[in-house]
């Protein structure tokens, strides 16, 4: 909710898309932003509808896992905005794209890493946690150059992991 609140406060054109094929379970009530009334519902839908109603800012959702590079690249393609800077002057501005990799498997992290490497401009924030520890890594690409390495550049062993997408389990 904090990122959504920030986007709302900045009053900038933004697209907010949540993708998740998981349903809310009792164990999610402890560490995630869900309430008992959400049990059994799609996580992406619950959060998108909640944030849209609270902040009055549109939120989109995909109620399934993103498991192909093509689908991920389509979702993170930046929009172009035309901004008037004077009576006869218009400027085209590219949307800033943030990819939040809140995934629980390394095959999905590898997919996000590949999308990061193919993007011109992208901020990719990956988070992961265990019972008593966790990490957040922020990778940044600007004009086709990596400014800050993504999680796969810092911990390359995750790119070699042999786990599966959630739908393959």
Where are these regions (language model features)?
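Adenine nucleotide-associated cytosolic modules
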Residues: 1-169
């Amino acid at each position: 909710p904090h990122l959504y609140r920030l986007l709302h406060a900045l009053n900038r054109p933004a697209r907010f898309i949540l993708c998740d094929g998981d349903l809310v379970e009792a164990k999610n009530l402890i560490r995630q932003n869900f309430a008992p009334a959400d049990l059994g519902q799609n996580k992406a839908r619950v959060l998108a509808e909640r944030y849209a109603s609270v902040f009055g800012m549109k939120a989109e959702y995909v109620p399934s896992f993103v498991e192909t590079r093509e689908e991920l690249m389509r979702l993170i393609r930046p929009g172009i905005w035309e901004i008037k800077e004077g009576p006869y002057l218009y400027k085209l501005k590219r949307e800033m794209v943030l990819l939040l990799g809140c995934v629980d498997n390394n095959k999905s992290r590898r997919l996000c890493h590949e999308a990061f490497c193919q993007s011109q401009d992208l901020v990719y924030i990956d988070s992961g946690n265990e019972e008593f520890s966790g990490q957040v890594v922020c990778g940044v690409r600007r004009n086709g150059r990596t400014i800050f390495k993504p999680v796969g550049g810092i911990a390359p062993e995750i790119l070699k992991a042999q786990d599966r997408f959630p739908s393959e389990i």
